[in-house]
Amino acid sequence: MQTDGHTSGAAEDPLVAAAKAGDKLRVKQLLEEADDRCQGDRKDPTAAFAAALQAFHTEIADTLLRLGAQPADVPPEELPSLRQAVDFGSPALVDALTHSSIRHRYPRTELNAMRDLARAWHEAGTEAELRRRTGSSDTIARTRVQDDEYCTVGELTLAGTTVRDGHGAILTHLEKMLGIRTSCQELVARALERDADHTAWSRAAIELSHRRQPEAWATAETLRADADPLRRLFGAELTRLFEVFADSHDEEYCVLAVAALTDWATAETDPTVLAEVLHGLSSYQGPRAEAALLLHTHHHVPAVRRAVAAGLGTPPHSRQPSDAAHQALLTLMNDPDTDVQIAACHSAGDIANGDRALTDTMASLLDHPERRVQLQAVHALARHHDERCVQAAERLGPPRPGYREDETYYLEAAWRYERPREDTSPG
């Protein structure tokens, strides 16, 4: 649990101070500035990683870990204890403390005790256990926070004590570390206690999808047929992950998943579930999958159209989309929803065959008021070897401070396209 006064305000290295303050944008800016000064030799983010963990800023710690922080270089006394992390209820904090490089620091007896602690929180309920520990009957302040790069959790504060509601996800993680095989039914129950953005949901889905066995597949099939759309939504994600984590397109459960999603796409009526189903078809542009996607090109819910746009591309071993897919991409690049436009432009870029109708529509997006659309259009045009990407990239300028990693991905395609032209120009 985190209590008021957890952190100190001592002056420190700017990167460490930014991590301790929870300023993610400043952390990224400082790392970029250090890269510039060192000509590409990235500043070691390990001390900032430790500071972020000490302050329970888990999303920043997750970012720093991805950017090269070395948990093994941090002494145990400079990190929160595993008990503190479990009590706090942050799956990301527990993940960081049990990173593969430092997992040996925890004997099995301690891991068993932490599993029992997580189970106690989970079974009691976060609110009830927080009230029991604080002895307060005051109103609980609730918010939703980003726990790691991908997932959110609930955060509750009462009587100066703050906890997160990720104990179910922590329990799943510790059980896996200990080699305990949790039943499919229990994992589904933990997921459905939360929503689709919560770590408990994604962790249960990933764990189940890695079980390439009849019991796990039967669980997905049962959820697909459920009357409750929330249960169907979890079933759709689970089915999609059976495909995502397949070793090959020919793997048994991959084939089953694609067939199930294709049939499901023609019958699902709930827009949220339908969007998840369609996302599962994005790797397969065969005739049946494409037909299932095209059926929903003009769906009234943007999330569904976005899934269609993301799924339409080229069939395997070809750079020529079908006429219907080609027309749908042109339509979706002019969609009123910005995210649909971006997804369609990305798929059109994947075709990379210089199609004039596609590239002209992409070029029209260079005048879009949002920078993220312009970036996607630059990248897509570069993939089609369309010289309009060069001037567009120049107009956009360098990546913005704090966004270099993301924006460089889009802009460097135009830079790569321009270099051969410069090398062959007379001079």
What is each residue range found by the language model?
Residues 1-10, 188-195, 207-208, 223:
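TPR-adjacent "capping" and linker segments in tetratricopeptide-repeat scaffold/adaptor proteins
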Residues 8-17, 39-51, 73-86, 106-121, ...:
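Ankyrin-repeat boundary/"N-cap" motif
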Residues 13-20, 46-55, 79-88, 115-116, ...:
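Structural detector for internal amphipathic alpha-helices that build alpha-solenoid repeat scaffolds
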Residues 23-31, 57-66, 90-98, 126-127:
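Ankyrin repeat structural motif
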Residues 34-36, 68-70, 101-102:
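Ankyrin-repeat C-terminal turn/loop position
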Residues 36, 60, 72, 180-189, ...:
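Amphipathic alpha-helical scaffolding segments comprising HEAT/armadillo-like alpha-solenoid repeats
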Residues 227-228, 269-270, 300-301, 336-337, ...:
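Short inter-helical turns and helix N-cap capping residues of alpha-solenoid HEAT/ARM repeat scaffolds
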